[in-house]
């Protein structure tokens, strides 16, 4: 379609309509609401580095599993201590991957982190705080390398226009 110059013959729409399935909404019902309805979100993969060693000699290594654990605990303070109570924010560590053996201290650990916010300034603060905390914990743990941050799945705030929402609601109620 793009090769057929569709972009040139189509007019820019006045509004975009989308839908999202919510577990909290009963089947067969349609929910509408003006204003902010779905938070902005981003995910980040963080890789922290250690120094591998045998589990019987942990003093010879830098344990990235312990490092990842301290990062998870410290990240929990972002929302509770750095974001104003009137704001909405979430920081979730959804996965940690590290190592393959019970008696080997591995070289690295990976954390998969997701954030949600309704305010772009809060979202930016979450990003900065995650990086600050990860970097500081890496220094405290004697990590031999800088952490790696890979951002993905970035979604903007869904903020429904009042007039468009009213028009859609009227159509569903008809």
Functional labels for PLM-detected ranges:
Residues 1-95, 99-104:
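Histidine/acidic-residue-rich, glycine-tolerant segments that coordinate divalent metal ions
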């Amino acid at each position: 379609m793009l090769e057929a110059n569709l972009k040139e013959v189509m007019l820019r729409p006045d509004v975009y309509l989308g839908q999202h399935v919510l577990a909290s909404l009963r089947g067969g019902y349609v929910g509408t609401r003006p204003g902010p309805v779905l938070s902005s979100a981003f995910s980040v993969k963080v890789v922290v580095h250690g120094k591998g060693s045998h589990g019987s000699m942990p003093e010879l290594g830098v344990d990235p599993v312990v490092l990842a654990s301290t990062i998870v605990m410290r990240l929990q303070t972002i929302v509770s201590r750095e974001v104003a109570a009137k704001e909405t924010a979430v920081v979730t560590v959804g996965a940690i991957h590290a190592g393959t053996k019970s008696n080997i201290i591995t070289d690295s650990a990976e954390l998969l982190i997701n954030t949600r916010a309704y305010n772009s300034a809060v979202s930016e603060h979450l990003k900065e705080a995650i990086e600050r905390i990860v970097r500081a914990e890496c220094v405290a743990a004697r990590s031999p390398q800088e952490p790696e941050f890979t951002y993905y799945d970035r979604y903007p705030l869904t903020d429904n226009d009042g007039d468009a929402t009213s028009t859609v609601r009227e159509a569903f109620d008809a």
